[in-house]
């Protein structure tokens, strides 16, 4: 009979062996880059060739031909290693990256009482097709009404797929295409759909995709509101543009293999604009599936708009930073949803709310804070509150960790009758309104500190919550949202990101009937519209505006459209003061707002644009520490000649400047501008310098004689003696102006790489 110790050892060895066996044989989705031109003539298609290199045909998920050269497959690590070593045609293999979603009044705030106020532009945007990669679409939304829309443009090569609870007949002359891509998601979920709520079709059961697509190009819907809030006409930026949706995001996120397949298809379908309100962490461009797909789109004249991320105000948190992508941060509107907490000590605290249920009456209720079963009760995490203490009371919950609306649900389930969600330092003074399941308001950090102190110091603290509906013409606005991700750009610090900010706080747009406005399973309410916040909301604003610019200037490249939006952006709010940051109410800077807040009226006629060709982007890539194979992965060419590479990535003809001294005292960049204004135009330069940097521009005057004429100028940046080499940043600007136009470029200065 074996001893107990030897039996234990045997069990440990067997358990370890089984763990290692499972670990080494566990399958994952891999993206495989292939030398496209190496396909043997014996294979009719690349699909056939790729399949021949796999042990099983069923392992192949997608074949990529446009946005990427290669395929994705479901393999274990041994198979992946074997595949990489089996052929010189296999250039790279990497795991499927996971991305996440970056989750009305807007047209008026942007000055779009009609599309740019140009009557002919509305009809001309009929030919623009905006592709939205997201959670799908709710086609029955009134925002997809196609009344008076002309026939679908002949360039459209896409289709409307049928699927679970989705008939292809649901598409029309407004919503012209709908597809879904789920192979990467299914493989990550064990080969199937893990959630009963998933719809194996383009149908949106999340709401996010319907919200973003209707923000970009929703038809005008009168008498729209969210439970009585934000009442008026809801419409997208480009109300007459067509929408094509590509469902790539599922319950566990958005997988790179699915995103690449959707971008591949969208480019071939004939979209003019791609809108992606999703992203992940930073990666080299040759491993960034969005950047790779976006390069192919740009090369074919497709404008790509991406959200900057919701990881602000953390420094260097910005996502989607490739220079051929428009990276969009978020700002506030001049609309608010005020709510108040009348305290028992006579003070009135101001906050916001979208609560629409039965009010609290006139009797104040007792306030409690941090009363629960765990140390996390201050955050109101699930199961953290003691119902015997919070029942019948208003609970103060700190913002953070779990979803804001979930906190309200936790309070309600514990028997609480109301909630005040108080910001901490992470969110500062930013106020985001939510449609809680019980009476609730959100307050900023300073107000929250007063509230927490009141609860702790008063023997019987009380409050009464009061809701005041919708208020317009709020000042100051816009303000940079605290959640909006910040620069500097960690992949290429010489490129300033984000590019611009747009409306991204408390945005009204269409919604899915499959889910309540909070997104919680226990929310039984159904609404046609919802109010959401995030750079997910600001991104489609710019996508729609890009569509309008494309309609007005069909000859403009994606880089020219991007330049027009950036150089005409404004940096003063509606009180004529510099933009502020909601995180701490301090002055904002280009790491937070990029070139500024978009101004579509001015973008229509920018005067000058900074255009960038595909060859210039390749010279930019050559200036990075990438191998030729890495660059080929992005540009999809048989070979790349880097003999004319830029000496510095900052030499790219970008509409903004990010100067990294990195031990040097002098940095010199040359830019080229193209005249898109009056034929005979003269521009003079104005420099707004930084305390530690001298700036000189030569020449100081640019004279144009014709439309399309190009002129160059050189900027010399000199770090003043005695400047300490720290992580500090300073900012300035360079503006070319004449009586009709101001073409402004922000400048960011840093001395050390982040």
UniProtKB/Swiss-Prot annotation:
Residue ranges of domain Inhibitor I9 in the record: 29-102
Region called Disordered, residue ranges: 191-215
Residue ranges annotated for the Peptidase S8 domain, each copy included: 98-604
Superkingdom assignment: Eukaryota
Principal place of residence: secreted
Residue stretches making up the PA domain: 367-452
EC number from the UniProt entry: 3.4.21.-
First-level EC class: hydrolase
Keywords: Autocatalytic cleavage, Glycoprotein, Hydrolase, Protease, Secreted, Serine protease, Signal, Zymogen
CDD domains from the UniProt entry: PA_subtilisin_like, Peptidases_S8_3
Glycosylated sites: 35, 223, 373, 641
Signal sequence bounds: 1-26
Propeptide, residue positions: 27-102
GO biological process: proteolysis
Annotated GO CC locations: extracellular region; Golgi apparatus; mitochondrion; plasmodesma
Protein name: Subtilisin-like protease SBT1.8
Lineage: Eukaryota, Viridiplantae, Streptophyta, Embryophyta, Tracheophyta
């Amino acid at each position: 009979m074996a001893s107990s110790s030897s039996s234990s050892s045997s069990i440990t060895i067997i358990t370890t062996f089984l763990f290692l066996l499972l670990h080494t044989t566990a399958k994952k989705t891999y993206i495989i880059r292939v030398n496209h031109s190496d396909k043997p003539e014996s294979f009719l298609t690349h699909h056939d060739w790729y399949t021949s290199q796999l042990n099983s045909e069923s392992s192949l998920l997608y074949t990529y031909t446009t946005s990427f050269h290669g395929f994705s497959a479901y393999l274990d690590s041994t198979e992946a290693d074997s595949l990489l070593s089996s052929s010189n045609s296999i250039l790279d293999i990497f795991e499927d990256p996971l991305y996440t979603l970056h989750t009305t009044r807007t047209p008026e705030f942007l000055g779009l009482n009609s599309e740019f106020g140009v009557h002919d532009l509305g009809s001309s945007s009929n030919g623009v097709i905006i592709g939205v990669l997201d959670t799908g679409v709710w086609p029955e939304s009134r925002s997809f009404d196609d009344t008076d829309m002309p026939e679908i443009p002949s360039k459209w090569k896409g289709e409307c797929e049928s699927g679970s609870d989705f008939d292809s007949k649901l598409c029309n002359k407004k919503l012209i295409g709908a597809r879904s891509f789920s192979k990467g998601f299914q493989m990550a979920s064990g080969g199937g759909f893990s959630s009963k709520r998933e719809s194996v079709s383009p149908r949106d059961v999340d709401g996010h995709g319907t919200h973003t697509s209707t923000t970009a190009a929703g038809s005008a819907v009168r008498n729209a509101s969210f439970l009585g809030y934000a009442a008026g006409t809801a419409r997208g930026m480009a109300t007459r543009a067509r929408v094509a949706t590509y469902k790539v995001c599922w319950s566990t996120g958005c997988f790179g293999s699915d995103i690449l397949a959707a971008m591949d298809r969208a480019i071939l379908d004939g979209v003019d604009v791609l809108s992606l309100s999703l992203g992940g962490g930073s990666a080299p461009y040759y491993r960034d599936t969005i950047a790779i797909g976006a390069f192919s789109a740009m090369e074919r004249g497709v404008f790509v708009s991406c959200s900057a991320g919701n990881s602000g105000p953390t420094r260097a948190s910005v996502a989607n930073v490739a220079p051929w992508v428009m990276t969009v941060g978020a700002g506030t509107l001049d609309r608010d949803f005020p709510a108040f907490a009348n305290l028992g000590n006579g003070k009135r605290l101001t906050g916001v709310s979208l609560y629409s249920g039965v009010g609290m009456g006139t009797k104040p209720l007792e306030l409690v804070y941090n009363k629960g079963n765990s140390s996390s009760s201050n955050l109101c995490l699930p199961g953290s509150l003691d119902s015997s203490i919070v029942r019948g009371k208003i609970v103060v919950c700190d913002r953070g960790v779990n979803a804001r609306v979930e906190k309200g649900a936790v309070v309600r389930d514990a028997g609480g009758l109301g909630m005040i969600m108080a910001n901490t330092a992470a969110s500062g003074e930013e106020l985001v309104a939510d449609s809680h399941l019980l009476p609730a308001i959100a307050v900023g950090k300073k107000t929250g500190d007063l509230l927490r102190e009141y609860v702790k110091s008063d023997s019987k603290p009380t409050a009464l919550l009061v809701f005041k509906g919708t208020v317009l013409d709020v000042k100051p606005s816009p303000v940079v949202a605290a959640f909006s991700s910040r620069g500097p750009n960690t992949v290429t610090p010489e490129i300033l990101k984000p590019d611009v900010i747009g409306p991204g706080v408390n945005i009204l747009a269409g919604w899915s009937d499959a889910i309540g406005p909070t997104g919680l399973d226990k929310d039984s309410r159904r609404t046609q519209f919802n109010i959401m916040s995030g750079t997910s909301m600001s991104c489609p604003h710019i996508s729609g505006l890009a569509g309008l610019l494309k309609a007005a200037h069909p000859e403009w490249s994606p880089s020219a459209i991007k330049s027009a939006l950036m150089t005409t952006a404004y940096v003063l709010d509606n009180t004529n003061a510099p933009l502020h940051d909601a995180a701490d109410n301090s002055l904002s800077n280009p790491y937070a707002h990029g070139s500024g807040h978009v101004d579509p009226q001015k973008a229509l006629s920018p005067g000058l644009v900074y255009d960038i060709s595909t060859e210039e982007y390749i010279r930019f890539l050559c200036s990075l520490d990438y191998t030729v194979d890495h660059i080929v992965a992005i540009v999809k060419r048989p070979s790349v000649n880097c003999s004319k590479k830029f000496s510095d990535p900052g030499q790219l003809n970008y509409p903004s400047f990010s100067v990294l001294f990195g031990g040097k005292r002098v940095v010199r960049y040359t830019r080229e501008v193209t005249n898109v204004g009056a034929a005979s135009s003269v521009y003079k330069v104005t420099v707004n310098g930084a305390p530690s940097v001298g700036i000189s521009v030569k020449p100081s005057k640019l004279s144009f004689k014709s439309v399309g004429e190009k002129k160059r100028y050189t900027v010399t940046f000199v770090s003043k003696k005695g400047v300490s080499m720290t992580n500090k940043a300073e900012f300035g600007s360079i503006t070319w102006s004449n009586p009709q136009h101001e073409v402004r470029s922000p400048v960011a200065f840093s001395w050390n790489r982040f």
